[in-house]
Amino acid sequence: MFTYAGNIHIHSLYSDGSGTIEEIAASAAAAGLSYIIITDHDTLDGLPEEGIRHGVVVLVGAELNRESHHYLALNLEQLAAGNEINPQEMVDRVRQSGALGFMAHPFEKGSPYIDRGKSYPWFRFPRDGFTGLELWNYTSTWRGRVTSVLRAVYWFFFNRKAAVDGPPREALALWDSYTSR
């Protein structure tokens, strides 16, 4: 049996990330990952950089941003438009294009101490048509647990692992509800 470890939700300099795809791939190799999927916000600019870099499979998709939900799409030829209110329409459009789609950070809570509390949870879940869901978005979970500036500073600079102990239970329960159908 083969086990492949990777990350399906990474941003580069093409949106709000801080590294080039080359730098991200080198870091992924150092961390022992087999693959990464670059999903910059509403852009496919990284597509020419797909391939194998530093022994890591690098794929490029997009995070389709809407106020009521964010959706990771892979194998898109162009960005999919979607209704702001109806996530099912977004899921259907991505699927009809032949792409794979994943619900991103479905239970994101945010913190008033970080980015003025902005978060992008899903308020309505699709019936079907998606490939999967992001069970654990470390950054979203971390931000949701920041309840003071002091705590944020301590966790960020001295003990990043203290705030996060695993995927949110509600995400696991949602996945279980879909897979038990």
Predicted regions and their residues:
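A metal-dependent hydrolase metal-coordination microenvironment
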Residues: 1-181
